[in-house]
């Protein structure tokens, strides 16, 4: 079965091997088995060194002088995000992460009407931010696998248009890739602003659809530092936003983007993120996406027959994430802990708070990056069998 999956996916192709080897060689050796890139990928030597070098430069010349010297690197990072979002003229603001980006956006949204349409499987913390800013959330219609039902969504959005459509392109609790390009086209036709949560999408699936807003994190598939994110906004929309903390009259004039980005910042982390973005572009976004989809195919095939678990995604889902739903009483939290303590395998336990309007029970998630191999996934499958058996008495 595994051989068939590998033949179908081409995971042993020279191109795949070259990318995997290049990605692996660019990073410190892994301590164990890392299958958790949807949570936090492993940074490269270049990203680590760039952040450290900037921090040293701050110590040498002062933080503000060092920040001025880093302007070109940060501009390159912004340009990379704009390109990966399909909006070359986007105004890009660095944030501390995806949730911060959404908070900045919704806190600055113009007008008094506050309605948005999003998937029933929306990320729990996103729902909290939406509620905090007074947005009325309307669920988009979906298919059985959680993918947006385009025809039904078109009718709903045309019949009663919300102020914006918010689409999380890949969820936190399930590795289904939403039809982003089709949703973008629909929103354009209906003249509805489209906001894309690309926290799990940037560097993983194609996000270059020219949405009005795209926001994302550094630490996931781009493999940058923690504590950094981005908010990319179409210029026309950016000018309509009203910063929650607008610049006072006595300050020099600031653009809306400058107002949103005003405040203290870890510039070293932003430099590391910008370098990671450059590495991603150098490796080839399309090649990375193809390799990640291959690994998802292999993982789901290898894990399909593991007792005690059900693979949630279809084998050919074009993402690297495999979600394992427990059956017969398997305990995702206990299994995750056992895998880490006994085999040094890093995975994610996803509780119902990840998608409180949809997820009925906790799940286990794996998310290999391009340097992982079929042997890694075989090793995980064997360890999962052992972990399930070892923790069966803990229920």
Curated annotation (Swiss-Prot):
Catalytic activity: S-(hercyn-2-yl)-L-cysteine S-oxide + AH2 + H(+) = ergothioneine + pyruvate + A + NH4(+)
Key word Transferase present: no
Inducing stimuli: Not part of the egtA-egtB-egtC-egtD operon.
Annotated stretches, region: Disordered: 1-21
Family classification: Belongs to the class-V pyridoxal-phosphate-dependent aminotransferase family. EgtE subfamily.
InterPro entries: Aminotrans_V_dom, EgtE, PyrdxlP-dep_Trfase, PyrdxlP-dep_Trfase_major, PyrdxlP-dep_Trfase_small
Gene3D superfamilies, per database record: Aspartate Aminotransferase, domain 1, Type I PLP-dependent aspartate aminotransferase-like (Major domain)
UniProt KW keywords: Lyase, Pyridoxal phosphate
Function according to Swiss-Prot or TrEMBL: Probably catalyzes the conversion of hercynylcysteine sulfoxide to ergothioneine. ERG is one of the major redox buffers which protects bacteria against redox stressors and antibiotics; loss of ERG or mycothiol (MSH, the other major redox buffer in this bacteria) leads to respiratory alterations and bioenergetic deficiencies that negatively impact virulence.
Molecular function (Gene Ontology), one example: hercynylcysteine sulfoxide lyase activity (ergothioneine-forming)
Keyword Cell membrane: no
Identification of the protein by name: Probable hercynylcysteine sulfoxide lyase
